[in-house]
């Protein structure tokens, strides 16, 4: 995943201020899923998507939800349930039958780009660290993510 993340961030960095960006993160799964917790994607207002959060079947709905986050500026958590016939992911054919929880949050200068520049720098310098993401409870606002370099 480190190489995928490094490649994604190197493609994002030159464009970070030309479009609005949303960071999508799989933060929890239940049962089987194509991507595991920690999978990330960056979605731009120009329609570009760097990385995937599913096997492809959820991406269109994730991009639609990302546009709503761009408009509101408020992070959201989305739950896709492949076993629930009433859930959108069931109708989309999620395929795995599991549950995927996704956090979508704005990425901009005001929130220090959610720590993504720090991650990119650490990867380039071969330093280890971790990203602390705040998953908002329903009806609450998320705090910005913070990247912490381990020494």
Where are these regions (language model features)?
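Segments forming oxygen-rich coordination pockets for charged ligands
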Residues: 1-151
């Amino acid at each position: 995943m480190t190489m995928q993340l490094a490649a994604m961030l190197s493609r994002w960095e030159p464009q970070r201020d030309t479009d609005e960006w949303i960071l999508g993160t799989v933060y929890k799964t239940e049962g089987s899923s194509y991507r595991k917790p920690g999978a990330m994607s960056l979605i731009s207002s120009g329609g570009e998507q760097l990385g995937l959060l599913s096997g492809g079947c959820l991406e269109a709905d994730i991009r639609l939800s990302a546009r709503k986050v761009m408009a509101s500026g408020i992070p959201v958590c989305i739950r896709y349930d492949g076993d629930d016939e009433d859930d959108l992911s069931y109708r989309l054919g999620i395929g795995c039958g599991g549950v995927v929880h996704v956090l979508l949050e704005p990425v901009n200068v005001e929130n220090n780009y959610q720590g993504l520049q720090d991650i990119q720098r650490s990867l380039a310098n071969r330093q280890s660290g971790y990203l602390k993401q705040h998953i908002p409870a329903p009806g609450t606002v998320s705090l910005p993510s913070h990247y912490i370099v381990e020494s």
